[in-house]
Amino acid sequence: GSSFEHPATRSAAKHWASQTERKYINVQHEDSNGDVTAELYSQIVNPDTRLVTILHASPVTGISVDLEAIAAAIRSIAPEAFIIVDGVQYAAHGGIKIDQYNIDGYAISPYKMYSRHGYGFAWVSDRLTQMKHEQLLDGPDDNWELGTRDTGSYATISDVVKYLEWLGSKIENTD
């Protein structure tokens, strides 16, 4: 984790580090600009690092990080580490290029994209999908849902997607 991250992410990371008897490692942001960089992660991550969380954009400053470079730096030192990204703030403001990041998870919360509270979306790698996790008893191993979906929430995101498609059509460069 890093000092750049949302307190909820840091709290969960610290909790699970304690539960698994591992040291929580904190990447300190640059005081001059509030950013975290691949170089800063390279100074802290070690070959025994098992999980790294990265905030794609700050909810306080709006600063986004070079996710691809940070993930590459982590993989060069701890190739087996799971890399989980909080994309909640970034999703509505930047193009998400999952295939370029070499990460294991990316989560968003649609309420930050003109939708409602109470649900979210995540992309997980095949490697993370197969990891042992809390799940319904006797359910499929790759199921990460613990209950019934709120279908109203999914209906609202359909309108958001239509709006974003319309907005994107008005911009020349949609890379």
PLM features per residue range, with description:
Residues G1-D175:
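Pyridoxal 5′-phosphate
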